């Protein structure tokens, strides 16, 4: 994934707005986005491990780096799941890749979601982190619809250094996240 300069935001404006809004004394108090974690759980991997190869390839395409395969922490007999079995993949984005992904998410991906009217403002965890779920991976421009074998969802967690939800919501609004009214 090539990271272009026009795909980034003007952080001096974001910092100035947040300092004015929350009356921070120092620039170091201003919250920022720490990392973005993209997770795809694959329940079918219990019966067919080769399904994970497609998920890993799709995550690699949309994030620009290799994902890590996640394994089951404990056995659940009803699901025929044993401890240590591969059940998904995740990727953690920081730095320039994080910025490019957030830009792409807010400007390209979310508007392509079917029946999109804005994201919920209730998905904060109380510590300034935001969780977002997408039902289909085909909304990303890098994913070729013809090569997708099965439509899968994913979780996107945006971890911020904000102390509470109001600071984090204002930060993400300045990043361009389209929240519902």
From Swiss-Prot:
InterPro entries: Ribosomal_uL5 (IPR002132), Ribosomal_uL5_bac-type (IPR020930), Ribosomal_uL5_C (IPR031309), Ribosomal_uL5_CS (IPR020929), Ribosomal_uL5_dom_sf (IPR022803), Ribosomal_uL5_N (IPR031310)
Keyword annotations of the record: Ribonucleoprotein, Ribosomal protein, RNA-binding, rRNA-binding, tRNA-binding
MF (Gene Ontology): rRNA binding; structural constituent of ribosome; tRNA binding
GO cellular component: a single term: ribosome
GO biological process: translation
Coiled-coil regions, chain positions: none
Metal-binding found in the keyword field: no
Keyword rRNA-binding applies: yes
PROSITE patterns given in the database record: RIBOSOMAL_L5
Annotated HAMAP family: Ribosomal_uL5_B (MF_01333_B)
Family designation: Belongs to the universal ribosomal protein uL5 family.
Subunit and partners: Part of the 50S ribosomal subunit; part of the 5S rRNA/L5/L18/L25 subcomplex. Contacts the 5S rRNA and the P site tRNA. Forms a bridge to the 30S subunit in the 70S ribosome.
NCBIfam families: PRK00010.1 (NF000585)
Function: This is one of the proteins that bind and probably mediate the attachment of the 5S RNA into the large ribosomal subunit, where it forms part of the central protuberance. In the 70S ribosome it contacts protein S13 of the 30S subunit (bridge B1b), connecting the 2 subunits; this bridge is implicated in subunit movement. Contacts the P site tRNA; the 5S rRNA and some of its associated proteins might help stabilize positioning of ribosome-bound tRNAs.
Name of the protein in its database record: Large ribosomal subunit protein uL5
């Amino acid at each position: 994934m090539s990271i272009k300069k026009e795909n980034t935001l003007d952080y001096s404006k974001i910092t100035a707005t947040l300092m004015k809004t929350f009356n921070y004394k120092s620039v170091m108090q201003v919250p920022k986005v720490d990392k973005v974690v993209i997770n795809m759980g694959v329940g079918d991997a219990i019966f067919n491990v080769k399904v994970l190869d497609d998920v890993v390839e799709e995550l690699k395409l949309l994030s620009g780096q290799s994902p890590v395969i996640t394994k089951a922490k404990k056995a659940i007999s009803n699901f025929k799941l044993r401890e240590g079995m591969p059940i998904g993949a995740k990727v953690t984005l920081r730095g320039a890749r994080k910025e490019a992904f957030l830009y792409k998410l807010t400007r390209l991906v979310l508007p392509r979601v079917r029946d999109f009217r804005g994201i919920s403002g209730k998905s904060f965890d109380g510590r300034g982190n935001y969780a977002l779920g997408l039902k289909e991976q085909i909304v990303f421009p890098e994913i070729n619809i013809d090569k997708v074998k099965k439509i899968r969802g994913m979780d996107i967690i945006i971890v911020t250094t904000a102390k509470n939800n109001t600071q984090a919501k204002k930060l993400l609004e300045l990043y361009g996240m389209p929240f519902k009214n």
